Amino acid sequence: MGDIEKQTEIREKKARNVMRELKIQKLCLNICVGESGDRLTRAAKVLEQLTGQTPVFSKARYTVRTFGIRRNEKIAVHCTVRGPKAEEILEKGLKVKEYELYKENFSDTGNFGFGVQEHIDLGIKYDPSIGIYGMDFYVVLDRAGRRIAKRRRAPGRVGPSHRVEREESIKWFQQKYDGIILPPKPKVKRTFHRRR
Protein backbone atom coordinates (compact mmCIF):
# COMPACT_ATOMS: atom_id res chain seq x y z
CA MET A 1 0.00 0.00 0.00
CA GLY A 2 1.37 3.36 -1.03
CA ASP A 3 1.19 6.64 0.84
CA ILE A 4 -1.53 8.00 -1.45
CA GLU A 5 -3.74 4.93 -0.93
CA LYS A 6 -3.41 5.22 2.85
CA GLN A 7 -4.33 8.89 2.77
CA THR A 8 -7.44 8.24 0.65
CA GLU A 9 -8.46 5.43 3.02
CA ILE A 10 -8.08 7.76 6.02
CA ARG A 11 -10.18 10.43 4.24
CA GLU A 12 -12.94 7.88 3.54
CA LYS A 13 -12.96 6.80 7.19
CA LYS A 14 -13.21 10.44 8.28
CA ALA A 15 -16.11 10.98 5.87
CA ARG A 16 -18.00 8.01 7.37
CA ASN A 17 -17.40 9.10 10.97
CA VAL A 18 -20.67 10.09 12.69
CA MET A 19 -18.87 12.61 14.90
CA ARG A 20 -17.66 14.48 11.80
CA GLU A 21 -21.16 15.02 10.35
CA LEU A 22 -22.34 18.63 10.22
CA LYS A 23 -25.74 19.55 11.59
CA ILE A 24 -27.76 22.70 12.18
CA GLN A 25 -27.24 23.86 15.75
CA LYS A 26 -29.70 26.75 15.45
CA LEU A 27 -31.38 29.14 13.04
CA CYS A 28 -31.69 32.80 14.05
CA LEU A 29 -34.33 34.96 12.36
CA ASN A 30 -34.03 38.72 12.68
CA ILE A 31 -36.22 41.63 11.57
CA CYS A 32 -34.68 45.05 12.18
CA VAL A 33 -37.32 47.75 11.89
CA GLY A 34 -35.17 50.63 13.15
CA GLU A 35 -37.89 52.12 15.34
CA SER A 36 -40.12 51.09 18.22
CA GLY A 37 -43.89 51.15 18.20
CA ASP A 38 -46.56 49.69 15.95
CA ARG A 39 -44.28 48.57 13.09
CA LEU A 40 -42.13 46.58 15.53
CA THR A 41 -45.09 44.78 17.10
CA ARG A 42 -46.35 43.88 13.61
CA ALA A 43 -42.89 42.48 12.78
CA ALA A 44 -43.08 40.40 15.97
CA LYS A 45 -46.42 38.98 14.77
CA VAL A 46 -44.78 37.94 11.49
CA LEU A 47 -42.04 36.02 13.32
CA GLU A 48 -44.58 34.43 15.63
CA GLN A 49 -46.64 33.23 12.65
CA LEU A 50 -43.54 31.79 10.99
CA THR A 51 -41.93 30.05 13.98
CA GLY A 52 -44.78 29.47 16.43
CA GLN A 53 -42.55 30.92 19.19
CA THR A 54 -42.69 34.23 21.02
CA PRO A 55 -39.91 36.45 19.62
CA VAL A 56 -37.55 38.64 21.66
CA PHE A 57 -37.05 42.39 21.20
CA SER A 58 -33.54 43.82 20.66
CA LYS A 59 -32.54 47.21 22.04
CA ALA A 60 -30.32 49.87 20.48
CA ARG A 61 -26.81 49.91 21.96
CA TYR A 62 -26.37 53.66 21.68
CA THR A 63 -28.14 56.81 20.48
CA VAL A 64 -27.89 57.70 16.80
CA ARG A 65 -29.54 61.07 16.19
CA THR A 66 -29.39 60.87 12.39
CA PHE A 67 -31.51 57.69 12.47
CA GLY A 68 -33.69 58.97 15.30
CA ILE A 69 -32.72 56.08 17.59
CA ARG A 70 -32.29 56.41 21.35
CA ARG A 71 -30.19 54.12 23.55
CA ASN A 72 -32.12 51.11 24.97
CA GLU A 73 -35.01 51.74 22.58
CA LYS A 74 -36.48 48.55 21.10
CA ILE A 75 -35.61 48.58 17.39
CA ALA A 76 -35.55 44.93 16.24
CA VAL A 77 -37.11 41.55 16.91
CA HIS A 78 -35.44 38.14 16.68
CA CYS A 79 -36.15 34.48 17.29
CA THR A 80 -33.94 31.37 17.66
CA VAL A 81 -35.26 28.08 16.27
CA ARG A 82 -33.71 24.63 16.74
CA GLY A 83 -34.34 21.06 15.64
CA PRO A 84 -36.56 19.92 12.77
CA LYS A 85 -38.51 23.20 12.81
CA ALA A 86 -35.27 25.07 12.03
CA GLU A 87 -34.60 22.78 9.05
CA GLU A 88 -38.15 23.31 7.77
CA ILE A 89 -37.93 27.13 7.96
CA LEU A 90 -34.44 27.13 6.43
CA GLU A 91 -35.77 25.05 3.53
CA LYS A 92 -38.46 27.69 2.91
CA GLY A 93 -35.90 30.50 3.03
CA LEU A 94 -33.50 28.76 0.65
CA LYS A 95 -36.36 28.03 -1.75
CA VAL A 96 -36.99 31.79 -1.96
CA LYS A 97 -33.28 32.31 -2.77
CA GLU A 98 -33.52 29.42 -5.31
CA TYR A 99 -30.76 27.59 -3.36
CA GLU A 100 -28.20 30.14 -4.59
CA LEU A 101 -25.76 31.80 -2.20
CA TYR A 102 -22.51 33.72 -2.55
CA LYS A 103 -19.25 32.57 -1.00
CA GLU A 104 -19.34 35.80 1.03
CA ASN A 105 -22.50 34.52 2.76
CA PHE A 106 -20.34 31.95 4.61
CA SER A 107 -18.19 32.98 7.59
CA ASP A 108 -14.75 31.59 8.53
CA THR A 109 -16.33 29.72 11.44
CA GLY A 110 -18.60 27.77 9.08
CA ASN A 111 -21.84 29.66 9.68
CA PHE A 112 -23.84 31.34 6.94
CA GLY A 113 -26.58 33.90 6.52
CA PHE A 114 -28.80 35.47 3.91
CA GLY A 115 -31.74 37.84 3.63
CA VAL A 116 -35.29 37.57 2.31
CA GLN A 117 -36.96 40.78 1.13
CA GLU A 118 -40.63 39.76 1.55
CA HIS A 119 -41.92 37.43 4.26
CA ILE A 120 -44.94 36.44 2.13
CA ASP A 121 -42.55 34.44 -0.09
CA LEU A 122 -42.09 32.03 2.84
CA GLY A 123 -45.70 30.85 2.57
CA ILE A 124 -47.30 33.24 5.07
CA LYS A 125 -50.59 34.69 3.86
CA TYR A 126 -50.52 38.45 3.17
CA ASP A 127 -52.36 40.51 5.78
CA PRO A 128 -52.92 44.20 4.87
CA SER A 129 -52.99 45.18 8.56
CA ILE A 130 -49.45 43.76 9.04
CA GLY A 131 -47.77 44.75 5.75
CA ILE A 132 -44.62 43.25 4.24
CA TYR A 133 -41.35 42.71 6.11
CA GLY A 134 -37.95 41.41 5.10
CA MET A 135 -35.82 39.29 7.41
CA ASP A 136 -32.34 37.90 7.93
CA PHE A 137 -31.57 34.19 8.30
CA TYR A 138 -28.45 33.15 10.24
CA VAL A 139 -27.54 29.46 10.37
CA VAL A 140 -25.05 28.08 12.91
CA LEU A 141 -23.52 24.72 11.94
CA ASP A 142 -21.61 22.42 14.27
CA ARG A 143 -20.50 18.86 14.91
CA ALA A 144 -21.25 16.50 17.78
CA GLY A 145 -19.07 17.21 20.82
CA ARG A 146 -19.53 20.98 20.88
CA ARG A 147 -20.90 20.72 24.42
CA ILE A 148 -17.45 20.19 25.98
CA ALA A 149 -16.60 23.82 25.23
CA LYS A 150 -19.96 25.16 26.52
CA ARG A 151 -20.57 23.08 29.66
CA ARG A 152 -20.21 24.64 33.10
CA ARG A 153 -18.22 21.92 34.87
CA ALA A 154 -14.85 20.87 33.42
CA PRO A 155 -15.08 22.79 30.13
CA GLY A 156 -12.58 21.84 27.43
CA ARG A 157 -11.56 23.13 24.03
CA VAL A 158 -12.73 21.90 20.66
CA GLY A 159 -9.60 21.07 18.67
CA PRO A 160 -8.84 22.85 15.40
CA SER A 161 -9.43 19.70 13.33
CA HIS A 162 -12.97 19.36 14.76
CA ARG A 163 -14.02 22.99 14.24
CA VAL A 164 -16.24 23.83 11.28
CA GLU A 165 -14.60 25.83 8.50
CA ARG A 166 -15.95 27.80 5.56
CA GLU A 167 -15.10 25.19 2.90
CA GLU A 168 -16.78 22.41 4.90
CA SER A 169 -20.01 24.37 5.36
CA ILE A 170 -20.07 25.26 1.64
CA LYS A 171 -19.65 21.56 0.78
CA TRP A 172 -22.43 20.64 3.25
CA PHE A 173 -24.76 23.24 1.68
CA GLN A 174 -24.04 21.94 -1.83
CA GLN A 175 -24.60 18.28 -0.85
CA LYS A 176 -27.67 18.67 1.37
CA TYR A 177 -29.63 21.23 -0.65
CA ASP A 178 -28.01 20.85 -4.10
CA GLY A 179 -27.02 24.47 -3.54
CA ILE A 180 -25.26 26.68 -6.05
CA ILE A 181 -22.40 28.98 -5.06
CA LEU A 182 -22.58 32.09 -7.23
CA PRO A 183 -19.46 33.91 -8.45
CA PRO A 184 -18.53 37.00 -6.40
CA LYS A 185 -20.41 40.21 -7.13
CA PRO A 186 -18.46 42.64 -9.33
CA LYS A 187 -17.00 45.45 -7.25
CA VAL A 188 -18.10 48.92 -8.28
CA LYS A 189 -15.21 51.25 -8.95
CA ARG A 190 -15.74 54.68 -7.54
CA THR A 191 -14.14 57.59 -9.32
CA PHE A 192 -13.23 60.62 -7.31
CA HIS A 193 -13.12 63.95 -9.09
CA ARG A 194 -10.52 66.39 -7.86
CA ARG A 195 -11.55 69.96 -7.44
CA ARG A 196 -9.65 72.47 -9.52
UniProtKB/Swiss-Prot annotation:
One of its GO terms (molecular function) is rRNA binding. The keyword Ribosomal protein applies. Disruption phenotype: RNAi-mediated knockdown results in a growth defect. It is found in: Nucleus; Cytoplasm. It comes from the Eukaryota. Pfam families: Ribosomal_L5, Ribosomal_L5_C. PROSITE patterns: RIBOSOMAL_L5. GO terms for biological process: translation. Keywords: Cytoplasm, Nucleus, Ribonucleoprotein, Ribosomal protein, RNA-binding, rRNA-binding. Belongs to the universal ribosomal protein uL5 family. NCBIfam families: PRK04219.1. Component of the large ribosomal subunit. PANTHER family: 60S RIBOSOMAL PROTEIN L11-RELATED. This is Large ribosomal subunit protein uL5B. The lineage of its organism: Eukaryota, Metazoa, Ecdysozoa, Nematoda, Chromadorea. The gene is rpl-11.2.
